[in-house]
A protein has these predicted regions:
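Bacterial N-terminal signal peptides
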Residues: 7-14
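Functional-site microenvironments in short loops/helix caps that host divalent-cation chemistry
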Residues: 69-70, 76, 124-336, 344-347
């Protein structure tokens, strides 16, 4: 049951608490990179998602167009920089196909046109979930990064995150925004359930956390960043992350204030783009902060249940890669091996996904 504090003109919560300041990379990050501030009525979600996903077609199911083959291999997974990514441990994965880039607005639009799918952020809110909240305030929407004009303390994320009625994948920053002209940008305002529905329709699936990190490391040593030891190798930005003073002054030294069109930065040795920065990406694994202490080493699929000690009782899935809002002074989640987490129905304007596919 939701509480009244979720909606006070805008809907607020402990949302995005993993953006709490990382004074040191080893600091305990307080919560998720993209927590829900608004939960749509999903009581029928299982049946709805299944009916949508079943509209996949045979040709799409068999196609690996736009994907890269990632051969089986072993690697060291995790990082000592964050408690929930420890211990660093040996993992092996079988070969799989991975989307060369994040799912774009154009690709997601094709899915919606084919299936009439309605994302979580677009669905009406159930008054029963928000007792005491006036019905007129229960307007579908989502979380939008809204930077303050001046420098602020980093202790209160509500200074730069706002619930915006009408924000969804077609209108990422609110009703006045559009994806027209941004068809090649990664689709955002996507919940785990939305990503899962698209993946099944496309004859694919979401990557496991192990597959995602294996592809991001791309055979490279256990470096600080996926691309190497230096934040700016040879003085060049190689990922879309935040430069300047967070959250009010993004100097956009890498050429982008928000999300960049896919393939704007160099591909990794496996031929895959934007596995670090740009937008967070959903993985199939449920999130547990202690999972690495008990995980299997061969093709790990994630824990059987979700548990976050900072928000027990809330089902969360793993997110990976960081986004254009991660900087070297705040939310350094482009550090190789680091993890994010998000409530299953959460969405925001720096969260997207890509898909993988098993070998035939």
């Amino acid at each position: 049951m939701k509480v009244y504090s979720l909606i006070i003109g805008v809907i607020l919560s402990g949302f995005y608490s993993s953006f709490a300041q990382d004074n040191k990379a080893v600091a305990v990050v307080s919560a998720t990179s993209c927590e829900a501030i608004c939960k749509a009525n999903t009581s029928k979600k299982a049946l709805l998602l299944q009916s949508i996903a079943n509209k996949s077609n045979e040709n799409k199911t068999k196609s690996t167009d736009g994907m890269v083959w990632v051969a089986a291999g072993e690697f060291k997974m995790g990082t000592t920089d964050y408690p929930d990514a420890q211990p660093v441990h040996d993992v092996s994965v079988k070969g799989f196909w991975m989307d060369q880039h994040e799912v774009t607005n154009a690709q997601f639009e094709a899915f919606v046109k084919a299936t009439n799918y309605v994302t979580i952020a677009e669905r009406p809110l159930n008054p029963e979930d928000y007792p005491g909240v006036p019905v007129e305030n229960l307007v579908p929407g989502s979380a939008v990064f809204s930077p303050p004009t001046d420098k602020v303390s980093l202790g209160n994320i509500q200074q730069w995150w706002k619930y915006v009625p009408g924000a969804n994948w077609k209108h990422p920053s609110g009703p006045e925004s559009t994806i027209v002209g941004f068809e090649n940008n990664p689709v955002v305002q996507i919940s785990y359930l939305d990503a899962q529905a698209y993946a099944k329709w496309a004859g694919k699936r979401l990557p496991t956390e192990a597959e995602w990190e294996f592809a991001a490391r791309a055979g490279r040593a256990h470096t600080k960043y996926y691309w190497g030891q230096d934040l700016k190798p040879d003085g060049k930005w190689v990922a879309n992350i935040f430069q300047g003073t967070f959250p009010n002054n993004n100097t956009a030294e890498d050429g982008f204030v928000g999300a960049a069109p896919v393939q704007s930065f160099p591909k990794n040795p496996y031929g895959i783009y934007d596995l670090e920065g740009n937008v967070w990406e959903w993985c199939s694994d449920l999130y547990r902060d202690d999972y690495y202490k008990n995980t299997t080493k061969v093709n790990p699929q994630g824990p059987l249940d979700s548990y976050d000690p900072e928000e027990s009782g809330v089902e969360k899935h793993v997110q990976r890669g960081g986004s254009y809002l991660c900087s070297d002074e705040y939310c350094i989640r482009y550090v190789a091996g680091s993890r994010g987490k998000g409530e299953t129905t959460s969405a925001c304007n720096h969260l997207g996904f890509r898909c993988v596919k098993d070998a035939e």
